[in-house]
């Protein structure tokens, strides 16, 4: 855990942290509704796994991610996921071929919401020594996800609890999730409505020994 913590902190400190602030141990916070761009990078090799627009309903725990057409270094369809965390299912949607897969989600944890049990580590400023109005006050949180046996370090803004970046690692994967162009509202709530061709799709059986979760889904794209 110490090696993981050092690696995660090093990443963000290198991004421009200029002054540590006194930490008062803030309570676990909840993300607002959001629309933005999510980029997923595999730190081993620096491969961009996916980048695209998302909508997140923080009240009903629904996430829609649609991969950008600019991410063309792949042979399969662009990823389009609707994740219903409260229901424990997600849909892999292919709008081009009007096909859909419905599968189980085995964990509620994801990169756009602090997982339960996240422990506050430090409060700091990111920005410039000379241009104070450009500084962003942020919190760093760390923890583990029991269902996935993974560890994470998350960077959120103070106040709104906007997730800026999440570093996630297991024995087999190491991913960095970056959140940008964030607007604190769901601009298109219809994104959470299933396409008609998905409505009658049966839940697929999960292969023995396999666990579907937000992090693993993006690792396999």
UniProtKB/Swiss-Prot annotation:
This is Ependymin-2. One of its GO terms (biological process) is cell-matrix adhesion. GO terms for cellular component: extracellular region; lysosome. The keyword Mitochondrion does not apply. GO terms for molecular function: calcium ion binding. Belongs to the ependymin family. It is found in: Secreted. The keyword Membrane does not apply. May play a role in neural plasticity. May be involved during axon regeneration. InterPro entries: Ependymin, Ependymin_CS. Residues 1-21 form the signal peptide. It comes from the Eukaryota. Keywords: Calcium, Glycoprotein, Secreted, Signal. EPDs are synthesized in the meninx and secreted in the cerebrospinal fluid.
């Amino acid at each position: 855990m110490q090696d993981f913590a050092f690696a995660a902190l090093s990443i963000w400190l290198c991004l421009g942290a200029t002054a540590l602030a006194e930490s008062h141990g803030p309570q676990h916070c909840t993300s607002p509704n959001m629309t933005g761009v999510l980029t997923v990078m595999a730190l081993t090799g620096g491969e961009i796994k996916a980048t695209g627009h998302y909508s997140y309903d923080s009240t009903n725990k629904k996430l829609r991610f649609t991969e950008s057409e600019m991410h063309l270094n792949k042979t399969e369809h662009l990823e389009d996921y609707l994740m219903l965390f409260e229901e424990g299912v997600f849909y892999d949607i292919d709008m081009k071929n009007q096909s859909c897969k419905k599968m189980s989600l085995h964990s509620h944890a994801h990169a756009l919401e602090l997982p339960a049990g996240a422990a506050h580590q430090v409060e700091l400023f990111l920005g410039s020594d000379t241009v104070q109005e450009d500084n962003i006050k942020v919190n760093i949180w760390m923890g583990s996800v029991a269902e996935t046996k993974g560890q994470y370090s998350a960077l959120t803004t103070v106040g709104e609890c906007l997730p800026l970046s999440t570093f996630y690692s297991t024995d087999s994967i190491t991913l960095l999730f970056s959140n940008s162009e964030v607007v604190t509202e769901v601009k298109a709530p219809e994104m959470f409505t299933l396409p008609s061709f998905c409505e009658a799709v049966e839940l697929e059986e999960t292969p023995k020994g396999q666990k579907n979760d937000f992090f693993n889904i993006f690792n396999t794209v």
